[in-house]
């Protein structure tokens, strides 16, 4: 736990120096190496929160619900033991973390690792059990394999499945959403969910390129993040975002509007 706090503190200092004033912390390192909970089940999350307090950065803490290793509720593997919660333990964790929070600087949210890591009933119950004002984050459609596996399991693509089976709105942030078709882009735009793009990580992992220009054309919303902290630079993330669209479309000046031409 102390190492996690030290690492988070270092990263938050780097972020503040780079101009970031707020971080949404996608936190799923919950347990000991053997998968057992710490004496205080919220130990790791509290260390990450304390790092935000110590550095002064604003934080939205997003404890991640991670229960399965694949679509359809497949059993987790040994390498995932530190991440795993059942739904009851997850709700208790969220309730504990919600106590004595400094609402001026810190927020909290609901977070699902991915559609392959949770079930429909878990998503629905978590959403009804926790405050409706909290933001909701999920990694979705990041890689082609995820899309293919989702289609094989359900007959639907990930964003399509989420829209049809659960639904999402402006409180949701769909992280990556790299591999979406035209209908899914339109669905996201209409919902006013935010697409959370992480250009440096997506480039580092070779994930692909999200169709930003299509989303903007339909009035959709997007934000940038760093995800794996490959780099901590707003300018670099935005440069990669724009250059990715140029490479995809073989045109210049892609991510702009008449109000912000450059």
Please name every model-derived segment.
Residues 1-36, 43:
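Metal-associated gating/positioning segment near the N- to mid-region
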Residues 31-175:
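Metal-coordinating catalytic core of metallo-dependent amide/deamination hydrolases
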Residues 128-135, 167-170, 187-196, 217-222, ...:
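Glycine-enriched alpha-helix->loop->beta-strand junction motifs that scaffold or abut catalytic
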């Amino acid at each position: 736990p102390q190492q996690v706090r030290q690492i988070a503190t270092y990263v938050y200092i780097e972020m503040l120096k780079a101009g970031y004033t707020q971080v949404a912390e996608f936190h799923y390192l919950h347990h000991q190496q053997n998968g057992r909970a710490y004496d205080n089940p919220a130990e790791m999350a509290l260390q990450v929160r304390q790092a935000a307090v110590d550095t002064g950065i604003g934080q939205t803490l997003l404890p991640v619900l991670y229960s399965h290793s694949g679509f359809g509720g497949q059993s987790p593997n040994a390498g995932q033991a530190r991440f795993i919660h059942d739904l009851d333990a997850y709700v208790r964790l969220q309730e504990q973390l919600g106590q004595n929070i400094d609402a001026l600087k810190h927020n909290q949210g609901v977070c699902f690792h991915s559609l392959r890591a949770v079930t429909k009933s878990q998503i629905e119950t978590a959403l009804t059990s926790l405050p409706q004002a909290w933001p909701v984050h999920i990694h979705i459609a990041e890689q082609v394999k995820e899309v293919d596996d989702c289609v094989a399991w359900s007959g639907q693509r990930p964003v399509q499945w989420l829209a049809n089976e659960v639904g999402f709105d402006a409180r949701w942030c769909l992280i990556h959403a790299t591999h979406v078709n035209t209908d899914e882009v339109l669905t996201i735009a209409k919902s006013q969910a935010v697409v959370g793009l992480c250009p440096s990580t997506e480039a580092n992992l070779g994930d692909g390129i999200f169709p930003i220009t299509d989303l903007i054309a339909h009035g959709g919303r997007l934000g940038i993040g760093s995800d794996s902290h490959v780099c901590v630079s707003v300018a670099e993330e935005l440069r990669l975002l724009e250059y990715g669209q140029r490479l995809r479309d073989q045109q210049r000046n892609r991510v702009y509007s008449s109000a912000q031409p450059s």
